[in-house]
Amino acid sequence: MYELNNFRSIKIALASPEKIRQWSKGEVKKPETINYRTLKPEKEGLFCEKIFGPTRDWECHCGKYKRVRYKGVVCDRCGVEVTKSKVRRERMGHIELAAPVSHIWYFKGIPSRMGLLLDMSPRSLEKVLYFAAYIVINPGETPLTEKQILTEKEYADAIEKYGPKFKAGMGAEAVKGLLESIDLDAMNIELRHKLKESTGQKRIRTVRRLEVVEAFRKSKNNPAWMILDVVPVIPPDLRPMVQLDGGRFATSDLNDLYRRVINRNNRLKRLLDLGAPDIIVRNEKRMLQEAVDALIDNGRRGKPVTGPGNRPLKSLSDMLKGKQGRFRQNLLGKRVDYSGRSVIVVGPELKFYQCGLPKQMALELFKPFVMKKLVQENYAHNIKSAKRMVEKVKPEVWGVLEEVISQHPVLLNRAPTLHRLGIQAFEPILVEGKAIKLHPLVCTAYNADFDGDQMAVHVPLSVEAQAESRFLMLSINNILAPKDGEPITTPTQDMVLGCYYLTIQDEGVLGEGTIFKDFEELLLAYETKAVSLHAKVKVRMKLSAEDSGKLVESTVGRFIFNEKIPQDLGFVDRSKDLYALEVDFLCTKGALGKVIGKCFRKHGNTITSIMLDYIKELGFKYSTRGAITVAVSDMDVPEAKAELISQAEQRVDKYEKAFRRGLISDEERYEKVIETWTETTEKVTDALMAGLDRFNNIFIMADSGARGSKNQIRQLGGMRGLMANASGHTVEIPIKSNFREGLTVLEYFTSTHGARKGLADTALRTADSGYLTRRLVDVSQDVIIRELDCGTETGIVAKAFKDGNEVIEELYFRIVGRHSIDDIIHPETKKVIVPKGDIIFEDAAETITEAGIEKVAIRSALACRSKHGVCGTCYGRNLATGEPVKVGEAVGIIAAQSIGEPGTQLTMRTFHTGGVAGSDITQGLPRVEELFEARKPKGLAIISEISGKVDISESKRKREVTVTDENQEVVTYTIPYGSRVKVKQGQILEPGDEITEGSVNPHDILRIKGVEGVQTYIIKEVQRVYRLQGVDINDKHIEVISRQMLSRIKVEEAGDTELLPGSLENVFAFELANQKAIEEGGEPATGNIALLGITKASLATDSFLSAASFQETTRVLTEAAIKGKEDHLIGLKENVIIGKLIPAGTGMKRYKNIAISTETDEKLDEIEETL
């Protein structure tokens, strides 16, 4: 086998007839497959052993030669070479066609490549190819023109009139003649000349033709190769035929399609030999053309060829495209050996880096390792007996398994793997039963619960894989979430509840005010029930044995909680107080997150993981001790409720009357009613919350962040309030009851609308979110950190994102973990807070915001000058580790996952604004999609093109806003009916400012404000959607994606470069072409940055493998083949497809020459053979 890692690129081009014959091992002449009696392949048929190789290893067809010793011998009786049967997966055959046929991809694709080259409309071309009309090949001295289309009658007339003076033909043969006579160089010069003169539609067509001509010129493809004289036959094992139980056969559709081609081809040969009448031959040629079309791409033209049950047959193109096609099913998603799956159960006794693996599963997964060990330890004499021991599960096996398994990490994965934390490594511990045990703290990352979820286990086999699992993927190394750098292993539910209960402080309880000499005495007093867990006591705290110490006051629970928590996390200023407890506050979920975050930054992951296990144990222990439960009596309905509701009802009646008298419109009445009930619900809730005891169990659950929220308490003990109906419109009749009192039938019915919509939305959202993630991954998969610093001096100016007075994202979050471009100087003290080029750490970012600095220039992926990917300095800190990012980190994929993973949490709703036209502003997931696809948004806002002063004029007919700039230039905007004007009379506007409410078209911003303006807009708008849902995502992820959306230039004028007008070029390729033109003293090309949506950007990538495996497979491959594209295997996807190591992380070139030394494992290879 050739070394996979040896080639640098992969090229695709048109195959010439000679090339197809060269690939082939023989011609397939008969449509037969296998003999129905002997079940052996027929000679010269579709499964012929002479052409494709033997069906059995080392055995010829007739049985004269059997065994390995005849390797390479060609049998003199049956002509089959004695070799391995797997050659049937690689040997190809061919069919010599009696008449040429066209390749449907090049004739039928959009735009039709054949049509553009011949300058014919696809319709006329189709008539010629399918024998409905004649085409003039050589007009001779007649008044006919070349490529003129003649009907049957016109042709007959012309023959009568001119006789043999001209030449016309039909079918692929005629087209082939025309294609052969094309002079590409002359055509290129002619088209470029035309381009300078033409405008409008003509120019567009000329550019398209020029593109195809250039593609053929540069790729050295011959246009005539778009017509096939020979059809290749793919290897038989890729279109298998298998016998089913009932003696029937199941076969691949391709065999049917090939059979049709062979039958029609043979019939045509026979007719030609017989010299049949022209009309019959023509019909047969047409049928052959249709058969080849169906084989290549069934259903592309006309009705698809169907099999039994009217099912369209799967052609070669169908084998490649879609989710079940070759690319996505087999090349990008392979099934792997050494894996298993089982149900998960919780394992609270596990350490943070451990998982419980069922014994039987472990034995099966580690079978070869166990067998090797059994032979080594002399339990078995050879591999075969070791295998028998394992299969019979002898008692010695378990001891050996324990040894093998220790120090050998396994990978656990839960589908759907939405981000990289969906696969983590653990050290396995053998457990009884058949369920995998999972540590409770990693559930958040996996989004796992124990209601029947299943997980898959994978065994990393090689030493390299084990090293990577241990040092990069072990759960301890995944404490922070890559999307925002916050801890993702925060305790949840019971653990939070226990910690909250433990750290509550109560007045006047048993043992309050007692003084203890040390912590042990306190613990003894608590265990003997002499002091309450919540009592405030004093304990003498010492830093060492010699230290006299100091009395510290806190609750018993907080002393217990602090026992194993590092006391230098920064909650207490240790310069002022050495002895106070570090965590001397009520521990809610958020507070615990802060503790973990500070511990990680201060002490790293090892100490943090020990602390996490301690918090977990405490939490479970004290939530059990606290015995916090839910009872009906915990929900007290506030007494003020009845009074508040009756007041609201009176107000609603008042509005009804006013409406009936015609004092207010129905719209106003509706809005006032909704407002009244919303206020009332709030008041009832406030009354309820004020009346709840701090020790009320339901309040404890909600307040601690363990489960439930204020909104749910309202529904239990207050009133449910207003509900939405299926269209998302609020129903004006509220639900006055709560769940404690029970709902009336009508109320229950009202609430079902919104509830069902919620469920339907969730199902749709999951699919949409998954598709968005897929597109994001595809557009950014080749963004890898390729160098430490690209050396650029530019970046972006970060300031807080605001919407009016409301802050969407504070400056702190935008600058932390980034490199500064200039020295950042304190405005008052004039000290340098952060020197030029340094990372802005948390404390520096806090100092900057406290100093009142509003703008900070930072390095950004948006301004990075790395040719492929981005550089480490522009990217900044790796959020998952808190360290500067390393070369080789696949930041593009991380960005896509970070944006896509919370996608399911976003809502689907479109937001109804009041007003008649009610312009719907899209929100939630559809809004994110709209932004990344750079679509024209719904509810479009009008924006100002110039800067200047506003003048608003209203007449009966229309409203107008006029903007006048300093040079007295005036632009007038007509405001459509129902739009809300955002600006005020006399206001000064900047270019790009909104005049009416709504969303702005990003293409307008690009035109008016330029690239930086549109980048800022995309980041701000995406952040707005996510922050509204309470999801924090770091800006740099959105920057990586928007960098990809703006990485192309649309060429306007080509100048003296080789670029084509209207083509999309890579920014760096464009600069290079211009540089070359200027050096040669020519005119450079002009162009503008194009804003592409993520789907378009993915398909515009330089790698044809990546684009083909994404969408529109046939279109991408057609174009790539004509251009003779070469894929330089820069991104991850291309390398996965061809089976190379990905060029990220340890797969980068710089790590190629590192060898890993280990004990030799030749034994294992031998075991593999046995298995």
UniProtKB/Swiss-Prot annotation:
Gene3D superfamilies: 1.10.132.30, 1.10.150.390, 1.10.1790.20, 1.10.40.90, 2.40.40.20, 2.40.50.100, RNA polymerase II, clamp domain (4.10.860.120), RNA polymerase Rpb1, domain 3 (1.10.274.100). GO terms for biological process: DNA-templated transcription. One of its GO terms (cellular component) is DNA-directed RNA polymerase complex. The keyword Protein biosynthesis does not apply. Mg(2+) binds at D449, D451, D453. Zn(2+) 1 binds at C60, C62, C75, C78. NCBIfam families: rpoC_TIGR. This is DNA-directed RNA polymerase subunit beta'. The gene is rpoC.
